[in-house]
Regions:
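A structured beta-alpha segment of the ubiquitous adenosine-cofactor-binding alpha/beta core
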Residues: 1-7
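Predominantly a Rossmann-like dinucleotide-binding segment in NAD(P)-dependent oxidoreductases
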Residues: 67-159
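Short, Asp-centered acidic motifs that coordinate Mg2+ and/or phosphate
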Residues: 9, 89, 176
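Beta-strand-loop-alpha-helix segment that lines the small-molecule cofactor/substrate pocket
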Residues: 9, 15-67, 82
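Structural detector of well-ordered beta-strand residues that form the stable sheet scaffold
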Residues: 34, 59-61, 91, 149, ...
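NAD(P)-dinucleotide binding in Rossmann-like oxidoreductases
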Residues: 152-162, 172-185
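Short glycine-/small-residue-rich Rossmann-like dinucleotide-binding loops
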Residues: 14-15, 181
């Protein structure tokens, strides 16, 4: 189809293991891509995706949906204009409780793929929702995490991936922080 009749971009909102194949196909066919995180399932796919983006000259966007919320934008503005002073401590959390039991054994689709390393990837809760907390911490403060120490746990017996995570953070500029994400809270 002529460009004026084609869709503008491809949106990828599939389980994690299915992000790269449609992105690859779209980029190879000249479509811009907007994808849920993670961009890829592993480093090999990430390197291939980077090459595809450069070769295609198409735009590629990765969604971090909470940065668009008005209160988040206001918090970022308050930090940027100095209304909160110098940031010394960052506390960010994303607690959930929906995986407090082995919901994945009941046929619930979301729980099924999110707790399966073959479909979700190597990280469970920390990759699923901890990344949103990390993104908010950096986005709002304007600081970058330079070091971390993580304690990831699978509290639910038989679960293959973490369902709870606590992370100590050190940011550029000297600030320190704590990130808590949990799907069993």
């Amino acid at each position: 189809l002529p460009v004026e009749e084609r869709m503008d971009f491809v949106s990828i909102v599939t389980p994690n293991h299915m992000h790269f194949p449609p992105a690859k196909m779209a980029l190879e066919n000249g479509f811009h891509v907007l994808s849920d995180k993670p961009a890829t399932f592993n480093l090999k796919e990430a390197k291939a995706l980077e090459k595809l983006i450069k070769k295609s000259k198409c735009l590629y966007g990765l969604t971090h949906n909470y940065t668009g919320y008005p209160l988040v934008k206001e918090a970022r503005h308050m930090v940027a204009t100095g209304k909160l002073g110098k940031i010394r401590k960052v506390v960010v959390e994303y607690p959930q409780g929906w995986l407090a039991t082995r919901l994945e054994t009941t046929g619930q689709k979301q729980a099924g793929w999110r707790t399966d390393p073959k479909r979700s990837g190597a990280a469970g809760c920390i990759g699923d929702i901890g990344t949103h907390a990390e993104n908010l911490a950096e986005y709002i403060t304007g600081l970058k995490i330079k070091e971390l120490a993580a304690d990831l746990t699978a509290f639910v017996s038989g679960r293959k991936l973490d369902d709870d995570g606590n992370v100590l953070l050190r940011f550029t500029g000297g600030a320190k922080g704590v990130l808590h994400s949990s799907q069993i809270s």
